[in-house]
Amino acid sequence: MKICFVASECEPLVKVGGLGDVVQSLAKELVNLGHQVSVILPFYKSIKAQNVQFITQHTLNLGGVYYDFHIYKTNLDNVDIFLIDQKTFFGREYVYGTPKGPYEDNYLRFAFFSLASLETLSHVCHIPDIIHIHDWHTALVAVYKDLYFKHLDETATVLTIHNIAFQGIFLGHILPQIGIPWGLFNPEDLEFYNQVNFLKGGIVHSDVITTVSKTHAKEIQTNMGFGLEGVLREKRYVFGILNGIDTESWNPATDKSLYQNYDINTFKAGKEKNKMYVKELFGLETPHTRPLAAFIARLAKQKGLDLIEKAVDDAVKIGYDFIFLGSGDYYYQGKVLDMVKRNMGYVAARIEYNDILSRKLYAGADMFLMPSEYEPCGIGQMIAMRYGAIPIVHKTGGLADTVVDYNEDNEHGTGFSFEDYTYKDFLYTMARAMIVYQKKYIPEDNEWYNIVSNAMAQDFSWRRSVQEYIKIYKTAKLIKMH
Protein backbone atom coordinates (compact mmCIF):
# COMPACT_ATOMS: atom_id res chain seq x y z
CA MET A 1 0.00 0.00 0.00
CA LYS A 2 0.96 3.63 -0.49
CA ILE A 3 0.49 5.47 2.80
CA CYS A 4 1.03 9.18 3.45
CA PHE A 5 1.29 10.46 7.01
CA VAL A 6 0.47 14.12 7.59
CA ALA A 7 1.63 15.15 11.06
CA SER A 8 2.97 18.06 13.07
CA GLU A 9 5.80 15.98 14.60
CA CYS A 10 8.13 13.16 13.58
CA GLU A 11 11.20 11.97 15.48
CA PRO A 12 14.10 12.71 15.16
CA LEU A 13 13.34 15.87 13.17
CA VAL A 14 10.81 17.37 15.58
CA LYS A 15 9.40 16.02 18.83
CA VAL A 16 7.37 17.81 21.49
CA GLY A 17 5.50 14.81 22.88
CA GLY A 18 4.75 11.16 22.15
CA LEU A 19 3.23 11.98 18.75
CA GLY A 20 6.71 12.37 17.25
CA ASP A 21 7.74 8.90 18.43
CA VAL A 22 4.59 7.26 17.09
CA VAL A 23 4.78 8.77 13.60
CA GLN A 24 8.45 7.85 13.18
CA SER A 25 8.16 4.32 14.57
CA LEU A 26 4.96 3.39 12.74
CA ALA A 27 6.26 4.71 9.41
CA LYS A 28 9.52 2.79 9.85
CA GLU A 29 7.74 -0.50 10.67
CA LEU A 30 5.38 -0.16 7.69
CA VAL A 31 8.35 0.34 5.35
CA ASN A 32 10.03 -2.74 6.84
CA LEU A 33 6.93 -4.72 5.84
CA GLY A 34 7.19 -3.54 2.24
CA HIS A 35 4.74 -0.62 2.19
CA GLN A 36 5.56 2.69 0.51
CA VAL A 37 5.39 5.39 3.18
CA SER A 38 5.88 9.15 3.08
CA VAL A 39 5.53 11.75 5.83
CA ILE A 40 4.61 15.41 5.32
CA LEU A 41 5.84 17.81 8.04
CA PRO A 42 6.12 21.56 8.55
CA PHE A 43 9.73 22.70 8.05
CA TYR A 44 10.10 24.26 11.50
CA LYS A 45 13.03 26.51 12.27
CA SER A 46 14.24 23.95 14.82
CA ILE A 47 14.57 21.15 12.25
CA LYS A 48 18.21 20.41 11.47
CA ALA A 49 17.83 17.81 8.73
CA GLN A 50 20.73 16.64 6.60
CA ASN A 51 20.67 15.80 2.89
CA VAL A 52 17.63 18.00 2.29
CA GLN A 53 16.73 18.43 -1.36
CA PHE A 54 14.68 21.33 -2.75
CA ILE A 55 11.78 19.98 -4.83
CA THR A 56 9.56 22.84 -5.94
CA GLN A 57 7.77 26.07 -5.03
CA HIS A 58 4.01 26.51 -4.81
CA THR A 59 1.54 29.31 -4.14
CA LEU A 60 -1.56 28.60 -2.09
CA ASN A 61 -4.81 30.55 -1.86
CA LEU A 62 -6.09 30.31 1.70
CA GLY A 63 -9.16 32.43 2.37
CA GLY A 64 -8.26 34.87 -0.41
CA VAL A 65 -4.68 35.38 0.77
CA TYR A 66 -1.86 33.94 -1.34
CA TYR A 67 1.02 32.21 0.44
CA ASP A 68 4.23 31.07 -1.24
CA PHE A 69 5.89 27.96 0.14
CA HIS A 70 8.75 25.64 -0.74
CA ILE A 71 8.75 21.86 -0.62
CA TYR A 72 11.88 20.00 0.44
CA LYS A 73 12.56 16.29 0.66
CA THR A 74 14.78 14.07 2.77
CA ASN A 75 14.79 10.37 3.66
CA LEU A 76 15.04 8.67 7.04
CA ASP A 77 14.93 4.88 7.49
CA ASN A 78 13.67 4.54 3.88
CA VAL A 79 10.75 6.86 4.65
CA ASP A 80 10.41 9.86 2.32
CA ILE A 81 9.96 13.04 4.39
CA PHE A 82 8.45 16.08 2.66
CA LEU A 83 9.03 19.37 4.48
CA ILE A 84 6.74 22.35 3.85
CA ASP A 85 8.71 25.56 4.28
CA GLN A 86 6.71 28.73 4.95
CA LYS A 87 8.71 31.16 7.07
CA THR A 88 5.77 33.27 8.32
CA PHE A 89 4.15 30.23 9.93
CA PHE A 90 7.04 27.90 10.77
CA GLY A 91 10.14 30.09 11.08
CA ARG A 92 9.61 30.48 14.83
CA GLU A 93 11.49 29.42 17.93
CA TYR A 94 8.81 26.99 19.11
CA VAL A 95 6.54 24.42 17.46
CA TYR A 96 3.13 25.18 19.00
CA GLY A 97 3.71 28.21 21.19
CA THR A 98 5.94 29.81 23.81
CA PRO A 99 5.96 28.67 27.47
CA LYS A 100 3.37 31.42 28.06
CA GLY A 101 0.84 29.76 25.77
CA PRO A 102 -0.01 28.66 22.21
CA TYR A 103 0.54 30.93 19.23
CA GLU A 104 -2.62 32.97 18.59
CA ASP A 105 -2.58 32.16 14.88
CA ASN A 106 -2.28 28.38 15.27
CA TYR A 107 -5.60 28.02 13.47
CA LEU A 108 -4.06 29.69 10.41
CA ARG A 109 -0.72 27.88 10.70
CA PHE A 110 -2.22 24.41 10.74
CA ALA A 111 -5.04 25.16 8.30
CA PHE A 112 -2.33 26.29 5.87
CA PHE A 113 -0.25 23.20 6.59
CA SER A 114 -3.23 20.88 6.05
CA LEU A 115 -4.10 22.46 2.70
CA ALA A 116 -0.44 22.64 1.60
CA SER A 117 -0.04 18.94 2.47
CA LEU A 118 -2.86 18.00 0.10
CA GLU A 119 -1.27 20.12 -2.63
CA THR A 120 2.04 18.40 -1.96
CA LEU A 121 0.75 14.86 -2.13
CA SER A 122 -1.30 15.73 -5.23
CA HIS A 123 1.61 17.16 -7.21
CA VAL A 124 4.82 15.80 -5.68
CA CYS A 125 4.06 12.46 -4.00
CA HIS A 126 2.38 9.46 -5.56
CA ILE A 127 -1.37 9.58 -4.87
CA PRO A 128 -1.69 7.32 -1.81
CA ASP A 129 -4.15 4.60 -0.90
CA ILE A 130 -4.31 6.01 2.64
CA ILE A 131 -3.83 9.46 4.12
CA HIS A 132 -3.13 9.02 7.83
CA ILE A 133 -3.64 12.24 9.80
CA HIS A 134 -2.84 12.88 13.45
CA ASP A 135 -4.62 15.03 16.07
CA TRP A 136 -6.26 18.41 15.53
CA HIS A 137 -3.25 19.97 13.81
CA THR A 138 -3.89 17.96 10.63
CA ALA A 139 -7.58 17.12 11.08
CA LEU A 140 -8.57 19.68 8.43
CA VAL A 141 -6.84 17.52 5.81
CA ALA A 142 -9.98 15.36 5.83
CA VAL A 143 -12.22 18.43 5.46
CA TYR A 144 -10.23 20.06 2.65
CA LYS A 145 -9.92 16.73 0.85
CA ASP A 146 -13.71 16.36 0.71
CA LEU A 147 -14.16 20.00 -0.31
CA TYR A 148 -11.49 20.61 -2.92
CA PHE A 149 -9.60 17.45 -3.92
CA LYS A 150 -12.09 15.28 -5.80
CA HIS A 151 -9.25 13.45 -7.58
CA LEU A 152 -8.46 11.93 -4.15
CA ASP A 153 -11.95 10.45 -3.73
CA GLU A 154 -10.59 6.90 -3.83
CA THR A 155 -7.98 7.68 -1.16
CA ALA A 156 -9.18 6.75 2.33
CA THR A 157 -8.55 8.96 5.36
CA VAL A 158 -7.60 7.56 8.77
CA LEU A 159 -7.49 9.94 11.75
CA THR A 160 -5.59 8.98 14.89
CA ILE A 161 -6.51 10.87 18.06
CA HIS A 162 -3.47 10.90 20.32
CA ASN A 163 -4.89 13.32 22.89
CA ILE A 164 -8.56 14.26 22.67
CA ALA A 165 -8.14 17.04 25.24
CA PHE A 166 -6.51 19.15 22.53
CA GLN A 167 -9.09 19.77 19.82
CA GLY A 168 -8.16 22.99 18.02
CA ILE A 169 -11.16 25.08 19.07
CA PHE A 170 -11.35 28.64 17.70
CA LEU A 171 -13.86 31.46 17.27
CA GLY A 172 -16.34 30.95 14.45
CA HIS A 173 -15.35 34.07 12.53
CA ILE A 174 -12.10 32.42 11.36
CA LEU A 175 -13.87 30.22 8.78
CA PRO A 176 -13.43 32.61 5.82
CA GLN A 177 -9.72 33.00 6.68
CA ILE A 178 -9.14 29.26 6.40
CA GLY A 179 -11.13 28.77 3.21
CA ILE A 180 -14.02 26.78 4.62
CA PRO A 181 -17.58 27.68 3.54
CA TRP A 182 -20.15 28.77 6.13
CA GLY A 183 -22.27 25.78 5.12
CA LEU A 184 -20.01 23.58 7.24
CA PHE A 185 -20.61 25.72 10.33
CA ASN A 186 -23.37 23.49 11.70
CA PRO A 187 -23.69 20.95 14.55
CA GLU A 188 -23.29 18.05 12.10
CA ASP A 189 -19.89 19.35 10.98
CA LEU A 190 -17.28 21.81 12.35
CA GLU A 191 -19.52 23.88 14.64
CA PHE A 192 -18.97 23.19 18.35
CA TYR A 193 -20.89 25.35 20.84
CA ASN A 194 -20.78 28.27 18.41
CA GLN A 195 -17.05 27.80 17.79
CA VAL A 196 -14.99 25.95 15.18
CA ASN A 197 -13.55 22.59 16.23
CA PHE A 198 -10.80 21.27 13.92
CA LEU A 199 -10.72 17.80 15.51
CA LYS A 200 -14.49 17.43 15.20
CA GLY A 201 -14.21 18.26 11.50
CA GLY A 202 -11.58 15.57 11.12
CA ILE A 203 -13.76 13.01 12.90
CA VAL A 204 -16.78 13.80 10.72
CA HIS A 205 -14.85 13.70 7.43
CA SER A 206 -12.48 10.76 8.06
CA ASP A 207 -13.35 7.20 7.09
CA VAL A 208 -11.88 5.50 10.16
CA ILE A 209 -10.96 6.86 13.60
CA THR A 210 -8.29 5.29 15.77
CA THR A 211 -6.93 6.15 19.16
CA VAL A 212 -3.93 4.83 20.97
CA SER A 213 -5.27 2.13 23.28
CA LYS A 214 -8.32 -0.11 23.46
CA THR A 215 -9.39 1.24 26.86
CA HIS A 216 -9.11 4.83 25.64
CA ALA A 217 -11.21 4.04 22.53
CA LYS A 218 -14.03 3.15 24.94
CA GLU A 219 -13.32 6.08 27.28
CA ILE A 220 -13.63 8.75 24.56
CA GLN A 221 -17.16 7.54 23.79
CA THR A 222 -18.18 8.30 27.39
CA ASN A 223 -17.96 11.48 29.46
CA MET A 224 -14.18 11.28 28.95
CA GLY A 225 -14.65 12.38 25.34
CA PHE A 226 -14.20 16.09 26.18
CA GLY A 227 -17.48 16.97 24.46
CA LEU A 228 -16.91 14.83 21.36
CA GLU A 229 -18.31 11.58 22.75
CA GLY A 230 -21.59 11.98 20.85
CA VAL A 231 -19.85 12.52 17.50
CA LEU A 232 -17.61 9.51 18.14
CA ARG A 233 -20.52 7.27 19.11
CA GLU A 234 -22.12 8.08 15.75
CA LYS A 235 -19.02 6.88 13.87
CA ARG A 236 -19.20 3.23 12.92
CA TYR A 237 -15.46 2.70 12.82
CA VAL A 238 -13.62 3.70 16.01
CA PHE A 239 -10.70 1.46 16.98
CA GLY A 240 -8.08 1.40 19.72
CA ILE A 241 -4.55 0.33 18.78
CA LEU A 242 -1.88 0.39 21.45
CA ASN A 243 1.23 2.36 20.58
CA GLY A 244 4.54 0.57 20.61
CA ILE A 245 8.09 1.72 21.24
CA ASP A 246 11.20 1.42 19.10
CA THR A 247 12.83 -1.51 20.91
CA GLU A 248 16.07 -1.08 18.94
CA SER A 249 16.49 2.45 20.21
CA TRP A 250 15.15 1.75 23.70
CA ASN A 251 17.33 -1.17 24.70
CA PRO A 252 19.30 -1.17 27.98
CA ALA A 253 21.63 -3.83 26.59
CA THR A 254 22.92 -1.54 23.81
CA ASP A 255 21.99 2.01 24.89
CA LYS A 256 25.19 4.05 24.66
CA SER A 257 23.83 6.65 27.12
CA LEU A 258 23.99 4.30 30.10
CA TYR A 259 26.75 4.08 32.68
CA GLN A 260 26.56 0.29 32.38
CA ASN A 261 24.51 -1.79 29.96
CA TYR A 262 22.40 -4.69 31.19
CA ASP A 263 19.64 -7.05 30.12
CA ILE A 264 16.98 -9.21 31.77
CA ASN A 265 19.69 -11.58 33.05
CA THR A 266 22.10 -8.96 34.40
CA PHE A 267 19.81 -6.18 35.62
CA LYS A 268 20.52 -6.65 39.35
CA ALA A 269 24.09 -5.38 39.10
CA GLY A 270 23.43 -3.19 36.07
CA LYS A 271 20.61 -1.18 37.59
CA GLU A 272 22.46 -0.75 40.89
CA LYS A 273 25.45 0.82 39.13
CA ASN A 274 23.24 3.06 36.99
CA LYS A 275 21.36 4.13 40.12
CA MET A 276 24.57 5.13 41.89
CA TYR A 277 25.67 7.06 38.80
CA VAL A 278 22.40 8.92 38.28
CA LYS A 279 22.09 9.85 41.97
CA GLU A 280 25.57 11.34 41.84
CA LEU A 281 24.64 13.16 38.62
CA PHE A 282 21.63 14.77 40.33
CA GLY A 283 23.39 15.42 43.63
CA LEU A 284 21.50 12.94 45.82
CA GLU A 285 23.68 11.51 48.61
CA THR A 286 21.05 9.44 50.45
CA PRO A 287 21.54 5.79 51.51
CA HIS A 288 21.48 3.50 48.50
CA THR A 289 18.76 1.34 50.05
CA ARG A 290 16.18 4.11 49.54
CA PRO A 291 14.13 3.49 46.37
CA LEU A 292 14.57 6.08 43.62
CA ALA A 293 11.33 7.15 41.90
CA ALA A 294 11.62 8.98 38.58
CA PHE A 295 9.15 11.30 36.86
CA ILE A 296 9.99 11.84 33.17
CA ALA A 297 7.27 13.71 31.31
CA ARG A 298 5.78 17.00 30.24
CA LEU A 299 5.12 19.15 33.31
CA ALA A 300 1.34 19.46 33.12
CA LYS A 301 -1.75 18.83 35.23
CA GLN A 302 -2.71 15.81 33.11
CA LYS A 303 0.45 13.97 34.19
CA GLY A 304 -0.65 13.77 37.83
CA LEU A 305 1.68 16.39 39.28
CA ASP A 306 -1.03 17.62 41.65
CA LEU A 307 -1.15 14.15 43.24
CA ILE A 308 2.62 13.90 43.41
CA GLU A 309 2.92 17.37 44.95
CA LYS A 310 0.50 16.40 47.74
CA ALA A 311 2.15 13.03 48.38
CA VAL A 312 5.85 13.80 48.00
CA ASP A 313 6.57 14.98 51.57
CA ASP A 314 4.99 11.86 53.10
CA ALA A 315 6.68 9.63 50.51
CA VAL A 316 10.09 11.06 51.42
CA LYS A 317 9.34 10.32 55.09
CA ILE A 318 8.61 6.65 54.35
CA GLY A 319 11.91 6.34 52.47
CA TYR A 320 11.59 7.54 48.87
CA ASP A 321 13.95 9.68 46.81
CA PHE A 322 12.65 11.50 43.71
CA ILE A 323 14.09 12.84 40.47
CA PHE A 324 11.99 14.95 38.08
CA LEU A 325 12.94 15.50 34.45
CA GLY A 326 10.77 17.51 32.07
CA SER A 327 9.62 20.90 30.90
CA GLY A 328 6.20 22.43 30.42
CA ASP A 329 3.79 24.78 32.16
CA TYR A 330 5.42 27.52 34.23
CA TYR A 331 2.96 26.76 37.04
CA TYR A 332 4.06 23.13 37.30
CA GLN A 333 7.72 24.01 36.85
CA GLY A 334 7.24 26.08 40.00
CA LYS A 335 5.51 23.18 41.76
CA VAL A 336 8.41 20.86 41.00
CA LEU A 337 11.00 23.38 42.21
CA ASP A 338 8.95 23.86 45.41
CA MET A 339 9.08 20.09 46.01
CA VAL A 340 12.87 20.21 45.64
CA LYS A 341 13.16 23.12 48.12
CA ARG A 342 10.92 21.42 50.69
CA ASN A 343 12.86 18.15 50.49
CA MET A 344 16.41 19.26 49.72
CA GLY A 345 18.72 16.27 49.43
CA TYR A 346 15.89 13.83 48.76
CA VAL A 347 14.26 15.39 45.69
CA ALA A 348 16.11 16.67 42.60
CA ALA A 349 14.96 18.07 39.26
CA ARG A 350 16.07 19.26 35.85
CA ILE A 351 13.55 21.49 34.07
CA GLU A 352 14.32 20.43 30.52
CA TYR A 353 13.57 17.80 27.90
CA ASN A 354 16.77 15.80 27.53
CA ASP A 355 16.74 12.45 25.72
CA ILE A 356 20.15 11.26 26.92
CA LEU A 357 19.42 12.20 30.53
CA SER A 358 16.03 10.47 30.35
CA ARG A 359 17.74 7.23 29.29
CA LYS A 360 20.16 7.43 32.20
CA LEU A 361 17.23 8.02 34.54
CA TYR A 362 15.14 5.11 33.23
CA ALA A 363 18.16 2.88 33.84
CA GLY A 364 18.91 4.24 37.31
CA ALA A 365 15.38 4.47 38.71
CA ASP A 366 13.79 1.75 40.80
CA MET A 367 10.30 3.07 40.08
CA PHE A 368 8.66 5.26 37.47
CA LEU A 369 5.80 7.61 38.38
CA MET A 370 2.93 8.08 35.94
CA PRO A 371 -0.20 8.85 38.01
CA SER A 372 -1.85 10.59 35.06
CA GLU A 373 -5.34 12.02 35.42
CA TYR A 374 -6.00 10.48 32.02
CA GLU A 375 -3.54 8.89 29.58
CA PRO A 376 -4.62 7.90 26.07
CA CYS A 377 -1.69 5.50 25.74
CA GLY A 378 1.54 6.61 27.35
CA ILE A 379 5.00 5.69 26.14
CA GLY A 380 6.95 6.36 29.34
CA GLN A 381 5.61 3.35 31.24
CA MET A 382 6.61 1.03 28.37
CA ILE A 383 10.14 2.42 28.22
CA ALA A 384 10.37 2.23 32.02
CA MET A 385 9.44 -1.47 32.04
CA ARG A 386 11.93 -2.14 29.24
CA TYR A 387 14.62 -0.61 31.49
CA GLY A 388 13.39 -2.36 34.66
CA ALA A 389 11.95 0.74 36.37
CA ILE A 390 8.67 -0.40 37.91
CA PRO A 391 5.71 1.86 36.99
CA ILE A 392 3.32 3.28 39.57
CA VAL A 393 0.29 4.41 37.57
CA HIS A 394 -3.32 5.53 37.66
CA LYS A 395 -5.48 2.83 36.07
CA THR A 396 -6.70 4.75 33.02
CA GLY A 397 -6.40 4.53 29.23
CA GLY A 398 -3.23 2.92 27.97
CA LEU A 399 -1.84 2.64 31.50
CA ALA A 400 -4.67 0.20 32.29
CA ASP A 401 -3.83 -1.77 29.13
CA THR A 402 -0.07 -2.03 29.70
CA VAL A 403 0.63 -2.22 33.45
CA VAL A 404 -0.47 -5.36 35.33
CA ASP A 405 -1.05 -4.50 38.99
CA TYR A 406 1.10 -6.58 41.32
CA ASN A 407 -0.29 -8.16 44.47
CA GLU A 408 0.37 -11.33 46.42
CA ASP A 409 -2.24 -13.19 44.37
CA ASN A 410 -0.85 -12.03 41.03
CA GLU A 411 2.71 -13.15 40.48
CA HIS A 412 2.59 -11.88 36.88
CA GLY A 413 2.37 -8.22 37.90
CA THR A 414 4.56 -5.67 36.13
CA GLY A 415 3.86 -2.60 38.27
CA PHE A 416 1.48 -1.00 40.76
CA SER A 417 -1.77 0.77 39.87
CA PHE A 418 -4.60 2.57 41.66
CA GLU A 419 -8.24 3.09 40.68
CA ASP A 420 -9.35 6.34 42.34
CA TYR A 421 -7.61 9.53 41.27
CA THR A 422 -6.86 10.74 44.81
CA TYR A 423 -3.59 11.50 46.53
CA LYS A 424 -4.47 9.02 49.31
CA ASP A 425 -4.87 6.17 46.80
CA PHE A 426 -1.64 7.21 45.10
CA LEU A 427 0.31 7.37 48.38
CA TYR A 428 -1.13 4.02 49.48
CA THR A 429 0.07 2.49 46.20
CA MET A 430 3.53 3.97 46.72
CA ALA A 431 3.54 2.40 50.18
CA ARG A 432 2.55 -0.97 48.66
CA ALA A 433 5.46 -0.70 46.23
CA MET A 434 7.83 0.27 49.06
CA ILE A 435 6.93 -2.83 51.10
CA VAL A 436 7.77 -5.14 48.19
CA TYR A 437 10.90 -3.16 47.29
CA GLN A 438 12.33 -3.50 50.80
CA LYS A 439 12.20 -7.28 50.47
CA LYS A 440 15.03 -7.16 47.92
CA TYR A 441 17.39 -6.72 50.87
CA ILE A 442 16.15 -9.94 52.51
CA PRO A 443 18.33 -12.90 51.47
CA GLU A 444 16.54 -15.42 49.23
CA ASP A 445 13.51 -13.13 48.75
CA ASN A 446 13.12 -12.52 45.01
CA GLU A 447 9.69 -10.87 45.01
CA TRP A 448 10.91 -7.47 43.78
CA TYR A 449 13.27 -8.98 41.25
CA ASN A 450 10.42 -11.11 39.87
CA ILE A 451 8.41 -7.96 39.17
CA VAL A 452 11.40 -6.40 37.40
CA SER A 453 11.85 -9.58 35.32
CA ASN A 454 8.15 -9.58 34.43
CA ALA A 455 8.33 -5.94 33.37
CA MET A 456 11.47 -6.34 31.27
CA ALA A 457 10.00 -9.40 29.52
CA GLN A 458 7.03 -7.45 28.12
CA ASP A 459 6.94 -7.00 24.33
CA PHE A 460 5.99 -3.40 23.52
CA SER A 461 7.51 -3.41 20.04
CA TRP A 462 5.58 -2.05 17.07
CA ARG A 463 5.39 -5.50 15.44
CA ARG A 464 2.00 -6.33 16.90
CA SER A 465 0.53 -2.85 16.58
CA VAL A 466 1.58 -2.35 12.96
CA GLN A 467 -0.37 -5.44 11.90
CA GLU A 468 -3.49 -3.92 13.46
CA TYR A 469 -2.91 -0.67 11.56
CA ILE A 470 -2.63 -2.60 8.30
CA LYS A 471 -6.03 -4.19 9.02
CA ILE A 472 -7.45 -0.71 9.69
CA TYR A 473 -6.04 0.61 6.40
CA LYS A 474 -7.66 -2.29 4.53
CA THR A 475 -10.97 -1.57 6.29
CA ALA A 476 -10.73 2.11 5.30
CA LYS A 477 -10.08 1.15 1.66
CA LEU A 478 -13.10 -1.17 1.66
CA ILE A 479 -15.28 1.64 3.01
CA LYS A 480 -14.12 3.85 0.13
CA MET A 481 -14.91 1.17 -2.45
CA HIS A 482 -18.49 0.88 -1.24
From Swiss-Prot:
Domain of life the protein comes from: Bacteria
Annotated catalysed reactions: [(1->4)-alpha-D-glucosyl](n) + ADP-alpha-D-glucose = [(1->4)-alpha-D-glucosyl](n+1) + ADP + H(+)
Keyword Repressor attributed: no
Key words of the record: Glycogen biosynthesis, Glycosyltransferase, Transferase
InterPro entries found in the cross-reference section: Glyco_trans_1, GS/SS, Starch_synth_cat_dom
Pathway named in the protein's UniProt entry: Glycan biosynthesis; glycogen biosynthesis
CDD domains in the cross-refs: GT5_Glycogen_synthase_DULL1-like
Protein EC: 2.4.1.21
Keyword match Lyase: no
Annotated ADP-alpha-D-glucose binding sites: 15
Enzyme class: transferase
GO biological process: glycogen biosynthetic process
Molecular function GO labels: alpha-1,4-glucan glucosyltransferase (ADP-glucose donor) activity; alpha-1,4-glucan glucosyltransferase (UDP-glucose donor) activity
Transmembrane segments: none
General function of this protein: Synthesizes alpha-1,4-glucan chains using ADP-glucose.
Family: Belongs to the glycosyltransferase 1 family. Bacterial/plant glycogen synthase subfamily.
Cross-referenced PANTHER family: ALPHA AMYLASE DOMAIN-CONTAINING PROTEIN, GRANULE-BOUND STARCH SYNTHASE 1, CHLOROPLASTIC/AMYLOPLASTIC
Protein's name in the database: Glycogen synthase
Gene source species: Hydrogenobaculum sp. (strain Y04AAS1)
Classification of source organism: Bacteria, Pseudomonadati, Aquificota, Aquificia, Aquificales
